[in-house]
Design a protein with these regions (language model features):
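Short structural boundary motif marking the start of a folded domain
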Residues: 1-4
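Short strand-turn-strand beta-turns centered on an Asx-Gly dipeptide
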Residues: 6-9, 53-54
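A short N-terminal beta-strand-loop micro-motif at the entrance of redox/enzyme domains
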Residues: 9-15
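Residue-level recognition of alpha-helix initiation/capping sites
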Residues: 14, 136, 146, 189, ...
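Iron-sulfur-associated redox domains of electron-transfer enzymes in respiratory
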Residues: 15-75, 79, 205-578
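Fe-S ferredoxin-like electron-transfer domains
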Residues: 46-190, 196, 203-222
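Structural motif corresponding to the C-terminal cap of alpha-helices
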Residues: 159, 198, 336-340
Length: 578
């Protein structure tokens, strides 16, 4: 243990503790910009500079460890002035048109600039004349980047993709796509973790709010919107509402207020996904010799992009079931169009998703109907719909609750937990057990697949089918480890759930940003609690899904179901060629 003094307060901490963490342990806050604990501790921004007695130079607190007897001053006049100088230097190479930035009001640089009262003009502006690329779901804006390296470290250490890298040397050094190429030419999964960990507006999702506003204003369009499970756990964070109050039904009211004609729940097609994917698993499991193993879930588009580029030998192991988002669009433009007696081309389908990769998924050539129209017309992230609410002056705190529209508005507890890591596996096993035995298991029988561990495994016995070995992973880093272990023959599973983002969709790349705070666990808890308190907790008991099969699809894995609800993962290619 080491004892030191910080701002006159004695503190004892373990050896190798940084000055920053030692200060935080006694509630002394040192400002940071580039720092991410355990991921980016490189002192790049120098905002966390502190003064250590006996040392001639100021030192960054994030990457300097404590020593016995050290005396630290975190807010001396010398320190404050150094921080102001560093902020001015950052601002000289930063596009300060804050009113045009989606991160305005939620930007670490903007906050620090205000905190240090940096008003008026600063150093001479030195912006780069590089055109920005708006052709992908993830957008990088050169003159908003502060070169903090967070995106590089997240992509490398957490997601193991290495998409971002430092480019150039000296003062022109910047961040760009590695090996140089455009983002669209890379094997980026568009998971969006670089976006949610950017402290400023240097990285953001492609903004599609204008398309939705145009559709809402078009009297010839019938606007249909779906809300993903994980969105209900995060949509009202900007408005500081308690999750218990910020219900999905209040969001329905907000969407109706905006002018959407029909508001449905993606939970409906999450249940439908379980019926198709669960039936597919049973078919494969009971005819093992006909298939490759293990079977992988396919509802996460970031994961699908990952396996196609990194482990193409396993593309055939993916479930052919479309994601709930895409199933919804397909059902709306067929079954619902028939129910409403309207031309499917009049239907404009909007998805509200916790995910940036969903934008890429909706644009795939394999996600179109026989007429060539997309299943889903526009995908909005949670952040985008919040901006739309703000623009429409909608205050969720004063809204009443409105039920989802019928017939695509009912979802079970099993569907809700699609938004948390382990939820798809849990839901699938609940219904697979029933489809084999004709009896429901305890809805919490498969709790071993829940929780925030990045790689979980379990074995369950389904009477009449045998032992089922399963695994659940979240984050592409954990996924790479699992895939390497499978390829090496070190592990053997029957069914694997993969989510590209740590913690699953609850921590998705399209969710609200809380700088340096990971929200996936608490949002996941919200979803598991909804499941626990829902009367119907099995996807196969969704009466609207049952009616859809009876009236239209006939049966899981049937001809019409295969046409509408399944896809060919070999029908499109990643830039790497697979």
């Amino acid at each position: 243990m080491v004892t030191l003094t910080i701002d006159g307060h004695a503190v004892t901490v373990p050896e190798d503790t940084t000055i920053l963490e030692a200060a935080r342990s006694i509630h002394i806050e040192i400002p940071t910009l580039c720092y991410l604990k355990g991921i980016n501790e490189i002192g790049a921004c120098r905002i966390c500079t502190v003064e250590v007695e006996g040392q001639p130079r100021l030192v960054p607190a994030c990457d300097n460890v404590v020593s016995q007897g050290m005396v630290v001053h975190t807010n001396s006049p010398r320190v404050r002035e150094a921080r102001r100088v560093n902020l001015r230097l950052l601002l000289s190479q930063h596009d300060t048109k804050c009113t045009k930035c989606t991160r305005s009001g939620n930007c670490k640089l903007q906050q620090l600039t205000n905190d240090y009262n940096l008003l008026g003009e600063h150093y001479i502006e030195d912006l780069r004349n590089i055109p920005d690329d708006f052709s992908n779901p993830v957008i990088r804006l050169e003159n908003r980047c502060v070169k903090c390296m967070r995106c590089i470290q997240i992509c490398d250490k957490v997601q193991t993709m290495g998409i971002w890298d430092l480019m150039g040397t000296g003062s022109p050094t910047t961040v760009g796509v590695a090996r140089p190429r455009t983002l669209g030419e890379s094997d980026c999964t568009f998971c969006g973790q670089c976006v949610t960990h950017c402290p400023v507006g240097g990285l953001q999702e492609h903004d599609d709010t204008g398309k939705v506003f145009d559709a809402l204003a078009d009297p010839q369009r019938i606007t249909v919107v779906q809300m993903a499970p994980a969105v209900r756990a995060a949509w009202a964070e900007f408005f500081h509402l308690d999750p218990k109050y910020a219900t999905a039904e209040r969001m329905v009211t907000a969407l109706k207020t905006m002018g959407f004609d029909y508001v449905f729940d993606t939970n409906f097609t999450a249940d439908l996904t379980i019926m198709e994917e669960g039936s597919e698993f049973i078919e494969r499991f009971t005819h093992r010799n006909k298939y490759h193993w293990p079977m992988f879930t396919s509802c996460c588009p970031g994961w699908v992009r990952f396996v196609k580029s990194q482990f193409p030998a396993y593309i055939g192991n993916l479930s052919t079931a479309k994601s709930p988002q895409q199933m919804f669009g397909a059902v709306v433009k067929s079954y619902l169009a028939d129910q409403l007696n309207v031309d499917p081309k009049k239907l404009f389908v909007v998805s509200i998703m916790p995910c940036t990769a969903k934008k890429a998924e909706a644009g795939l050539p394999t996600m179109r109907n026989a007429e060539g129209d997309p299943d889903v017309d526009v995908v909005l992230t949670t952040r985008e719909i919040v901006r739309m609410f703000r623009g429409e002056q909608i205050n969720p705190a004063v809204l009443s609750e409105t039920p989802f529209d019928s017939p695509l508005g009912f979802g079970t507890g099993a569907a809700v937990v699609f938004g948390a890591t382990g939820g798809v596996m849990d839901a699938a096993l609940r219904s697979a057990y029933y489809l084999v035995t004709g009896k429901n298991p305890d809805p919490d029988a498969f709790h071993a697949v829940r929780g925030m561990d990045s790689w979980k495994e379990a074995k369950f016995t389904i009477p009449g089918a045998g032992d089922v070995r399963v695994a659940v992973v979240s984050s592409l880093g954990a996924t790479r480890k699992l895939m390497n272990a499978i390829a090496a023959g070190e592990v053997d599973y029957d069914f694997v759930e993969v989510m590209a983002c740590p913690g699953g969709c609850a921590g998705g790349g399209g969710q609200p940003i809380h700088d340096s705070v990971e929200m996936a666990a608490s949002r996941g808890d919200v979803l598991w609690n909804i499941d626990k308190n829902t009367k119907v907790r099995f996807s196969h008991e969704n009466k609207d899904v049952q009616a859809l099969y009876k009236e239209y699809l006939r049966q899981p894995l049937g001809h019409k179901a295969h046409t509408l609800l399944h896809t060919d993962h070999f029908g499109w290619k990643m830039p790497s060629g697979h």
